Amino acid sequence: MNALPKTLLLGLCIALAACQSTQPDTLAKSARLNISEPLLAGLEYAQLLNGDAPWAGADRVQVDDQGLLLLDAAGNSLARHAGRFEGLDHRVDDKGLLLATVERKRQQAMLIGLNAARAWSQPLYLPRTAFAIEGLCLYRDSARNDFLFLLGEEGVGEQWLVGSQGRLLGEARRVRGLSLPPQSAFCQTDDRAGQLYVNEENVGFWRYPADAEAPLQREPVDLRQPFGSLAHAAAGMTMVPGGLLALDSEASVLHLYRQNEAGWQADEVIALDGFDEPERISARRSAEGVELLLADERGLQSARLDWQPPALSQPEPIVSLPAAVETGPVPSLGDAADDPAIWVHPRDPAQSRVLGTDKKGGLVVYDLDGRQVQDLRVGRLNNVDVRNGFRLGSKRVDLAVASNRDHNSLHLFAIDRASGVLSDVGEVATPLSEIYGLCMFQDRQGTTYAIANDKDGTFLQYRLDGRSGQPRGELVRRFKLGSQPE
């Protein structure tokens, strides 16, 4: 049997991934598009407000030769920030508005807020990028952190943390660089689902996880024919609950997708007669269907689409707690910081310590302000735990135990109850071949135990005793799970 060429195999794999349902072969007739007059000539960037705005009558945000504008439905200005800008995205709630754009003269991304009293915040400028910014989009996670994605045409991108809890940061923080498809100029995010959508002009539309710590893995939403339903060029896209609307600019058509449990289902294709390569779109769900703003080479056109995709019920997002303190990096490079434990000072909680394993080199100790106070270079420690009131010779100390992957041992540290200083008091050997996780337990009689596991699922429980002045461990229980525990 002859093997398929690699290029054909790749094409088949992508096509199978993209074909989540039957693709429409002809232009659909059921969803009616009603174009409104007049055309707003020369305008490229405008978005319908999606959310509960605090200003009566507020309808959309817009970029024109006057700057950034907040407008009502009749086009009257409710607020204006002067300047020359390109690109636009927004988030709005009952507290106010957050806008993202690019300041043309500086060639820098800019964020600015508008509060309920229509007062503008100080602009927040991102550092100038090494690439020309082709597209941008905001993302607000479940903890109300605001991020900005920047796209460059050569397949480069960046993600920046720009705000938190409805406030812009004093200084934006670059979270990560992104390797994106070439010819990417449009993006959108789904805040609730934590997804980033990006176009690749000559290929199709892709979906990525938007979370900053998620792997940058993509899935196709739709691809060019014959692997998908797109005829020519993937351009701008927008979202409404239960629906994705995406433009094929060269074909002058609008693709509609319904959300189902498996992903996105190609629903209908709407001809955009009279449009000249429409590239940008904004949408807002209404009782009658979907309100649209469409921008092409001539300008901006409003429309109404008689289409109401059912919105899927979404699970409640996992609650995230913002960090109050951050330490500096651990001494080892790369993915090294691993497992923390907190030792509480018995008399002065402000003098408590945070113990963190550097899984490439040892145990690092921090105060509650995140400052490093000790660095114990004892080997590759993976997990650490703490218990109080351990008898070590004639004195009572608190005890930290860590799993040492260099020696497959339990590594013990005495904690001085007055100063919080840790000292290395030895190791307890184990027969494990790849020690991994560890936790501690103290029974009602005050006996202290350490429970360690191997990558093969084996667990060993040791009774710890330090009355002789030298800690010892007695194996008291052994059991095994069917897969690797953490």
Region locations from a protein language model:
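Sequence/structural signature of beta-propeller domains
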Residues: 20-486
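Hydrophobic helical h-region of N-terminal Sec-dependent signal peptides
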Residues: 8-14
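C-terminal motif of bacterial Sec signal peptides marking the signal peptidase cleavage site
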Residues: 16-18
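Bacterial N-terminal signal peptides that target proteins for export
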Residues: 1-8
